A protein has these predicted regions:
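PLP-dependent amino-acid enzyme catalytic core
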Residues: 1-161
């Protein structure tokens, strides 16, 4: 087992190999058994640490799968722009994987998105467009309508939904 040091002492590395891309970190997150919860019981509690994905959530898996599938089936061309409405972790996953795979990303988001999520999205290179998240489906200012409009204006743009 490889051991790595950190500020709290020594801990086992969950993946000590050298990877060729940050996308190789997506998935295969560690599983930890919570012994203290089951002391004296005839059961096991295992938790999957999805926060260990590069974007901080299980949505990185979804983004990677969506992009790889779309690239494989030809609906997402090399270098094409990804346009999606999201105010959460799916947008962060798409921005991260999009950047790593050479796709510009435009995220249409709510005005209520947290500063932390906004910072992550921009750090991953996403262009942000604010939408009225409470606008009904018939309102041209709702997030989906804005995403559809932007995607229609950009040659070869791709939407996951």
């Amino acid at each position: 087992m490889t051991i790595i040091g950190d500020s709290r002492g020594v801990r086992p590395a969950y993946n000590a190999g050298i990877l060729s891309s940050v996308t190789d970190l997506i998935g295969n997150t560690p599983i930890v058994e919570l012994h203290n919860l089951t002391r004296g019981l005839d059961c096991r509690v295992l938790v999957k640490l999805e926060s260990r994905n590069p974007g901080g959530s299980s949505k990185d898996r979804i983004a990677l799968n969506l992009i790889r599938t779309a690239e494989a089936d030809g609906s997402l061309l090399p270098g094409a722009t990804i346009v999606e409405s999201s105010s959460g972790n799916t947008g962060i996953g798409l921005a991260l994987v999009g950047r790593l795979t050479g796709h510009p990303v435009i995220i249409i988001h709510s005005a209520f998105i947290s500063n932390e999520k906004r910072a992550l999205l921009t750090a991953y290179g996403a262009e942000l467009v604010e939408a009225d998240w409470e606008a009904g489906p018939e309102n041209p200012q709702n997030a989906r309508a804005i995403a559809d409009r932007i995607a229609a204006e950009i040659p070869n743009a791709w939407r996951s939904s």
